Amino acid sequence: VTGPRVLARDPEHARALLAAVTAWTAANGLSSAHINFHAADEDALFEDGWLLREDIQYHWTNPGHWQTFDDYLADMDHKHRKNIRQERAKVTRAGITFRVVHGDEASEADLQAMHRFYLQTFMDYGNAPALTLEFLHHLAARLPRQLLLVLAMDGERPVAGALCLRGGDTLYGRYWGGASLP
C-alpha cells in the first residue's frame, strides 16, 4: 500500500532521517536500504544515492457478492467463463488435484517441495532467492494458521505450489513455483 514512509515533521528533518539511514547502512556493511511504496509527494526527498524501484502489484478485491467460484464466473462474459472452465477441466483430466495446507499441517515434505518450487522460480528468472527452508519452518511454527500453502499434486507428488500468508480478511500471495514437467 502506497503511503507516507519517511515520518518526519518537515522536509528538512526527513532528509536528515534519510541521511542517517544511508550512514547506518554503510556503517553496518549493508549493500542497500529500501523504502518501498512511498507517497508521490515524498519523491523529492530521495536524492543522490537512492534509486527508484519500478514495481507492479496486483490487488484482487471481492466486491462482496462472490460467495463461490461460480458467482465469480457469473460476472464474466461468456468467452472468459468458457476459457476458465476449459482450463480447469484440462487440469482435472490430467489428474492434478490441489491440497490447501496450513503451517501447522505442513509436513517436512510439503515445506521442502514448496522451497524447491520457490528456488526454481528464482533460478528461472535469474534472481537471488532470499527465503531459506529454515525460514519456512519458522513461518510454519510461528504462524501456524496464517501460513498457507496451495500444492498442486500429481498423485502423491507435488508439482507446483504457492506460498501465501493470511491476515484478517486478506490473503497475501507472493511466492510460487513448479517442477519442470515433460
Language model: regions and residue ranges:
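Conserved acyl-donor/pantetheine-binding loop and adjacent beta-alpha core of acyl/acetyltransferases
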Residues: 1-5
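Conserved acetyl-CoA pyrophosphate-binding loop and the N-cap/start of the following alpha-helix
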Residues: 10-20, 182
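A conserved beta-strand-loop-helix scaffold within acyl/acetyltransferase catalytic domains
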Residues: 22-182
